[in-house]
Amino acid sequence: MASREEIFSKVKSIISEKLGVDESQVTEEAKLIDDLGADSLDLVDLVMDFESEFGVKVDDADLEKISTVGDIVSYIEKKLG
């Protein structure tokens, strides 16, 4: 099982690459839309990448509750058990 730090590292890398932001901006507290400039299409792309990378399914209802990088890490961590 991946540790929280390993999950965060992979999530950070994916977000940095997809959104074209420096990895130093991608903190657990960073808001995907407000701080990192993601839009709804970016979120869909990111979710597909997370699902592929971690082998988890992100439910649409759960996606609405995710606003920060830390939310994503916690969600994936929970899904991986």
Swiss-Prot record:
The modification O-(pantetheine 4'-phosphoryl)serine is found at residue 40. It comes from the Bacteria. Keywords: Cytoplasm, Fatty acid biosynthesis, Fatty acid metabolism, Lipid biosynthesis, Lipid metabolism, Phosphopantetheine, Phosphoprotein. GO terms for biological process: lipid A biosynthetic process. Residues 5-80 form the Carrier domain. One of its GO terms (molecular function) is acyl carrier activity. One of its GO terms (cellular component) is cytosol. NCBIfam families: acyl_carrier, PRK00982.1-2, PRK00982.1-4, PRK00982.1-5. This is Acyl carrier protein. It comes from Thermotoga maritima (strain ATCC 43589 / DSM 3109 / JCM 10099 / NBRC 100826 / MSB8).
